[in-house]
């Protein structure tokens, strides 16, 4: 299985002046935890890190004689463009790909393995977790419009996995139609292509705010304590 790690995050919501993936988490940069989990996965055989040139040296510095091929791929100005760049940077023999947010640094090796097994069996999927809160749809005036059925709501996460050829076709259609999507599953939805959810649990958070960093520190401490 080939893996693309989206690593072009900013530090704006962190109040930081650099890529949030380079902020310290339990003594190491956030991105180091993400890469380590991918390297420990039994099914991941090739890793592409998609990011901006300004972060290249710092991100690659976290690698210490990696056990698998790890390649740097120059990203675009948006996540959608960066995924396109990542797809272009895949080896010719790549048939399936997982795409993972570098900021989801609590993903464990077994999650990558579970996702890879489903994708290699021919099913597009996303890691996700059922929504536990009651969700309200609210208008621009701040007034509640309605309450979606919580039993049908899942919070999308990563990894997200697809057949490479089909994902490339989807992105080509998005470019032709001028579509903007926030993840690849949304692209599949527009095209009417099925995507399965795989329950990854609530710990697979995306580190975006200082509070998220605190939560991630606590989770890592619990895992370390065994």
Swiss-Prot record:
<dbReference type="InterPro" id="IPR001228">
    <property type="entry name" value="IspD"/>
</dbReference>
<dbReference type="Pfam" id="PF01128">
    <property type="entry name" value="IspD"/>
</dbReference>
<dbReference type="InterPro" id="IPR034683">
    <property type="entry name" value="IspD/TarI"/>
</dbReference>
<dbReference type="InterPro" id="IPR029044">
    <property type="entry name" value="Nucleotide-diphossugar_trans"/>
</dbReference>
<feature type="site" description="Positions MEP for the nucleophilic attack">
    <location>
        <position position="150"/>
    </location>
</feature>
<keyword id="KW-0808">Transferase</keyword>
<keyword id="KW-0414">Isoprene biosynthesis</keyword>
<comment type="similarity">
    <text>Belongs to the IspD/TarI cytidylyltransferase family. IspD subfamily.</text>
</comment>
<keyword id="KW-0548">Nucleotidyltransferase</keyword>
<feature type="site" description="Transition state stabilizer">
    <location>
        <position position="20"/>
    </location>
</feature>
<comment type="function">
    <text>Catalyzes the formation of 4-diphosphocytidyl-2-C-methyl-D-erythritol from CTP and 2-C-methyl-D-erythritol 4-phosphate (MEP).</text>
</comment>
<feature type="site" description="Positions MEP for the nucleophilic attack">
    <location>
        <position position="206"/>
    </location>
</feature>
<feature type="site" description="Transition state stabilizer">
    <location>
        <position position="13"/>
    </location>
</feature>
<dbReference type="GO" id="GO:0050518">
    <property type="term" value="F:2-C-methyl-D-erythritol 4-phosphate cytidylyltransferase activity"/>
</dbReference>
<comment type="pathway">
    <text>Isoprenoid biosynthesis; isopentenyl diphosphate biosynthesis via DXP pathway; isopentenyl diphosphate from 1-deoxy-D-xylulose 5-phosphate: step 2/6.</text>
</comment>
<protein>
    <recommendedName>
        <fullName>2-C-methyl-D-erythritol 4-phosphate cytidylyltransferase</fullName>
        <ecNumber>2.7.7.60</ecNumber>
    </recommendedName>
</protein>
<dbReference type="InterPro" id="IPR018294">
    <property type="entry name" value="ISPD_synthase_CS"/>
</dbReference>
<dbReference type="InterPro" id="IPR050088">
    <property type="entry name" value="IspD/TarI_cytidylyltransf_bact"/>
</dbReference>
<dbReference type="GO" id="GO:0019288">
    <property type="term" value="P:isopentenyl diphosphate biosynthetic process, methylerythritol 4-phosphate pathway"/>
</dbReference>
